[in-house]
Amino acid sequence: KFRKTKRLVSARVISSYIPPRWSQIRLSGARVAEAIRAKVIPVTESSPVSALSSLEEEDLLVPTQRFQMSKLLKNPAIFGYLLLAIITLIQSRNRFGALNGGALAASPSGARDLWGFYFESWHQVGMGSSHASPAWIAVLAMASTLLLGKAPLLVTVFFLAAPVLIMWSGHTFLRKLSSNQFITIPASFLYALSPVALTSVNSGRLATLVALMIAPQIPIILSNWKQVELNSWRRIYGLCILLAVLTSFTLITTLVCLGVIGYAIVTDYDEKLAKPLFLARIYKRLTLLIFPFILVAPYSFEALVRPARFFAEPGLNLAGGTAALVLSGNPGGAGSLPWWTISPILLLLIIALFSSSNARSFAQVGISFMCAAVLFSSISITVHGNSSGTRTWVGTLLVGATLASVAAGVVILDRLRTVLIASNIHYRHILAGLLLIVTAMYSVSSIGWSITAGADSPVQSNMKGVMPAFLTAEADTKTLVLREVGSANSKSIQYYISRGEDISLGEPDVASGQVRAIEIAAQELIDGSGISSSQVFSAYGIKYIFVKNPFSRNVIRTIDGLGGFART
């Protein structure tokens, strides 16, 4: 309004001097491409040479400068990203195609199916469900629209590019702590190959991968958390949108924000701040807590009635690791690193806790996340239609511990060399050597495992479906599916109700709990006491019982011996 009242020339006169919108977009694209080219292949500026000096005979003998690959690879950023891309391609050799397996369900054919599933009020999952669809379905639908609606292509590209994107996001944060690329690039490289990152890719954990990418951007956007009133409302709302995207994938983000913001409010209250300053801080902090939770409604509101959803992640509910494994920074579960690949995360946090630099603050945050992860890993939850409890997956909490550990390591190493040179040999030299040895051993062991045995992960491409073709021919026909899961030493039998096709993205998240009568009938069918199981199944419209090979022959003979069932 102020410029409108003070302008001297009308907008019609000015518009003739402004280039068209398409020209501006094309010029911006050219500038971005030129900036990337100059960053990757820097050009040395040469001073202008006169025509007389250029014709001198001795200048003709000077060789011209040529592009050398060795100079390019000496750039730590280019070498780090290139090495990570090569490792990712080798360990992803079984993931070129439509992905499923682990916690990742099969992708629908296109974005239209995702949009339809998101807006449906009744879902044909199991016995039927009226639960609200999670907001991450809409996020995937919008992203797949950019790829011409190819949802399977989006999921494949996301898992292939995830390690590089995680490294880039971590590097953008770590370079704020140190200008030495020989420290920040290896640190971001290890962040992308951390146990939680490798396990998330192998087991199909969408939410944890998104958290690994978004977490480093949060302290960049909100650089001054203690004096939050200095941040503009535009920055606050921008962070709200970023937190809403993360909350749409996992509601544990709300619990983390509740703990962090609650602690900050109590600290401000103890400092006895002036009332205007205290209110200015509390308004912006509560905005970061409430707005992301509202933006992912109504799925978030249903979690208030079913608190177990705060600990659930997208996809099938697979068990996480034990508390001892989580304490080492490894979330455990299917596709996780073996126990002998010891991560330096806990050692870094302990060393940084006794540091006199800013590394101590990062260590305090990291240990808080680590303690929360160990606590919740001992809890079993019942979500996504499961009738039995499953050990909680705490990968999202370990993201905070991993990022804090890497940041503390960067702060320590940035000033470690000068401190060690200026001091005599004492415990700092021993701890530094021990840390470097553990980090090197983890790097070699994790990379070696990921490109060999780790490539045969639960998430693979073009995996065979569970349901055979003759059962998928009848649409919406209810089928009780029995299959064995687990290792050769400890096997268990799982069952679920199918609607004529394999479960797809989003369906496990809206699945309702099993009907108690069907649950009892299925258990009696397996143990051989289900004389009336066929009557219960027919009463609920279950037409077929499908046993997925390999399966115990004794259980199959038991089912054949019961009345009311006929082989087809």
Question: How does the language model describe each region?
Answer:
Residues 470-540:
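Extracytoplasmic/lumenal acceptor-recognition loop(s) of multi-pass membrane glycoenzymes
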Residues 103-110, 197-209, 315-331, 365-428:
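Membrane-helix boundary/interfacial segments in multi-pass membrane proteins
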Residues 37, 41-48, 53, 117-123, ...:
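Periplasmic/ER-lumenal interhelical loops and adjacent helix-loop junctions
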Residues 29, 47-92:
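Start-transfer (signal-anchor) and selected internal transmembrane alpha helices
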Residues 89-216, 221, 225, 229-231:
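Active-site lumenal/periplasmic loops and adjacent helix-entry segments of GT-C-fold
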Residues 224, 256-290:
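Perimembrane helix-loop-helix junctions
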Residues 416-446:
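Signature aromatic-anchored transmembrane alpha helix within multi-pass, membrane-resident enzymes
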Residues 226-245, 283:
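Short hydrophobic alpha-helices at membrane interfaces in multi-pass membrane enzymes
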